[in-house]
Amino acid sequence: MSNQQIVISGVGLWTPPHQISNEELVVSYNAFADRYNAEHQAAIEAGELAAKPHSSAEFIEKASGIRSRYVYIKDGILDPARMTPQIPLRDEGDLSDQAEIAVEAAKKALAAANKTASDIDAVIVSCAYTQRYYPAIAIEVQEALGIKGFGFDMLVACSAATFALQRAYEMVAAGTARAVLTINPELTSPQNNFRDRDSHFIFGDVATATIIERQETSSSEHCYDILTTQAETIFSNNIRSNIGYMVNANDDDPYREYNYFHQEGRKVFKEVCPMAAAHILSLIHISEPTRRS
């Protein structure tokens, strides 16, 4: 096998200690819906507002296949008067929430790859959201783990993990890094609209990490060849999360539904599934099967 073969040599997974079942989510949401409908009864009857429909555990499972999800902080999510996690604000000198969960996943990936901080040249944090714009979460993680070299953040929504892997692959292939640590600290619950029947059940919180390096430098018990990589993007307005630093300049309300995650689920399904299937098939066709000796 060529010395240029690039592999995934270690993976790490962190899951929160808290879970929310469909049944818990439905009880909370339905209580919120009843409260909302009562408070806006006149506007609803006048046709100025739409009533909030009830949900059910059966509806959620049929629509998504999901029965339960992990969340970073459970407090506040199930409170009909709040409907969002209540996460204590940390001082600037403390490790951020997102860096903390990233570090936990990273340590497991390093252990699986039999690597130390001195073996890593770059850190990529790639996820749907970062909790701040700068300093980069990746550089905060780099500092916490004692890694030299460089780090940067990427935001690529649902494809964040795969885009990070491709960037890592390219850096190792180009020789600009011996090994790259990619981390996906998905802290999505603060942007999940728990007041919306059609999306409140979709996301949870998790952090994953991988080590990418050449096979010749790998000493892990298990490693997996990367056969090829290829990226593709198409713009769509059918899935959005509009919160950003312009919210105050726009004189906008950061808590209105427009600024939370929202989607046209059926349209997203029709856009994404054919594209993803075609993309995967194209990669299979251009990849040469590889068997480890």
Regions found by a protein language model. Give the residues of each.
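Short acidic capping loops at alpha-helix termini that bridge into adjacent secondary structure
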Residues: 116-122, 150, 178-179, 291
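Short acidic, glycine/serine/threonine-rich loops at helix termini
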Residues: 19-20, 134-137, 165-166, 191-197, ...
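Flexible, glycine-rich active-site loops centered on histidine and acidic residues
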Residues: 176-207
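Single conserved hydrophobic/aromatic residue that forms the stacking wall/gate
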Residues: 285-293
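Condensing-enzyme catalytic core mediating Claisen C-C bond formation in acyl metabolism
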Residues: 1-95, 196-274, 278, 282
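Short beta-strand segments
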Residues: 9-12, 126, 155, 180-186, ...
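Hydrophobic alpha-helical hairpins/lids featuring a short glycine-rich hinge
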Residues: 99-108, 112-113, 128
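Conserved catalytic cysteine-centered active-site region
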Residues: 57, 61-82, 89, 93-96, ...
